[in-house]
Amino acid sequence: MKTANHPDTVLIVDFGSQFTQLIARRIREAGVFSEIVPFQSAEAAFKRINPKAVILSGGPASTSDIGSPRAPQIVFDAGVPVLGICYGQMAMCVQMGGVAESSNHREFGRAFVEIEKDSPLFEGLWATGQRHQVWMSHGDRVIALPPGFQVFGKSESSPFAIFGNVERKMYGIMFHPEVVHTPDGARLLRNFVHNIAGIEGDWTMRAYREHAVEAIRKQVGKGKVICALSGGVDSSVAALLIHEAVGDQLTCILVDHGLMRKDEAAGVVAMFRQHYNLPLILVDASEKFISALEGEVDPEKKRKTIGRLFIEVFEEEAKKLGGADFLAQGTLYPDVIESVSFTGGPSVTIKSHHNVGGLPERMNMQLVEPLRELFKDEVRALGKELGLPESFIGRHPFPGPGLAIRCPGGITREKLEILREADAIYLDEIRKAGLYDAIWQAFAVLLPVQTVGVMGDGRTYEFVCALRAVTSVDGMTADFYHYDMAFLGAAATRIINEVRGINRVVYDVTSKPPGTIEWE
């Protein structure tokens, strides 16, 4: 979605931090639209957007490195408020005439700042003499302030942890206010955009809807669009948004790749045909997908194979429809972040997603991705704005590659059927216990491991099933759900008793990070 017509935009210059998108999230929570751009193209973006304020993100580089990233000088010369975070603080310091250096006393994780002087940045939050918890991740520090700047706070290893120039409305902070581990961080960012930058904060999902519809119409024109519908919240919201924008230029296609949950394809078709009146085609491509995936153990190759086959199927269906110019997907921020830096900046790739990094380089259709700037909870809010029922909006996320990435190792039809049954029982137990809405995402994983068991008087040698459940807000970080042991025992017993091929059940207690929510 372009922001050229939005008068109150915050430009976020991305230096490669994995938390850059969380900055955007916090700014949006404050009711202010934001756009992330890589530092390499920040000058052009600044001229295009004419932002009301600029935030410089953190990043993995050191200002001492030759060729390390810098913000365009226009950011500091234009007279708009600027906030530098972590590496962004270092870049601001050096570019404004101060001095920064690599430090032997690094700060990672929880830290504390001591307030030395009151500042508009933390007005109503922190006062002189107070000590407050923050979250840091840096190896550099400021050793000399730029001319006209003053210190507002210090930390154990940095005498200039918070500095600024009140008259020019420029501030630098060594910590990360965007993460939840800085308790007052979100309010500090609100102070910056509302009080210092003077932005009212009137951006809402209704506003996003209007801008997205306008952007879709501009991109699509009179072209035909096919939408990859999975029945999940993301693709459903994308389909409704695009349908609102271009009407009968849209055709939805549900590809049954043989990797869906139990009875899912039939349920999705019934819901969308009966309740939303969207043109929907069901394609049974299960043989095509499973044959291509059978025996493949590399998770990246699985994802890329699925991405390639999806495009092949969509292009085949487009021909049957007389041609299509665009392929629409429900790609979200976290999908893009884990595949490659959203902005093309220097963030580290974690894994490819089938609808991002798994796409072939050559396609005969252009992509339409109206949700790629939104977090999951924002998509749910947009779905509510579009009229989707709460019961549907609250569904757990389900990945496009489906059960393929919940079946580590080689895939077979037999394994998929075992996993499908175990997953259905697990989710049924969660619903019966009244826990479904308290959990962000829950699913079963069939491990490529067999163990010895005893059932009746006989020896068994069958698969291990891992259960996964996490709590999260936006999918960027997650904690495992703390079940009562009685629940886990009951779910495990039912799975072992009812699913032939499983004789052992384990529970995954890994958070994100260090793990990802999905196993592959």
UniProtKB/Swiss-Prot annotation:
The keyword Nucleotide-binding applies. The active site is at C86, H176, E178. GO terms for cellular component: cytosol. It catalyses: XMP + L-glutamine + ATP + H2O = GMP + L-glutamate + AMP + diphosphate + 2 H(+). Keywords: ATP-binding, Glutamine amidotransferase, GMP biosynthesis, Ligase, Nucleotide-binding, Purine biosynthesis. Its EC number is 6.3.5.2. Residues 9-202 form the Glutamine amidotransferase type-1 domain. It comes from the Bacteria. Residues 203-395 form the GMPS ATP-PPase domain. GO terms for molecular function: ATP binding; GMP synthase activity. Transmembrane segments: none annotated. Pathway: Purine metabolism; GMP biosynthesis; GMP from XMP (L-Gln route): step 1/1. The keyword Cytoplasm does not apply. ATP binds at S230, G231, G232, V233, D234, S235, S236. Homodimer. Catalyzes the synthesis of GMP from XMP. This is GMP synthase [glutamine-hydrolyzing]. The gene is guaA.
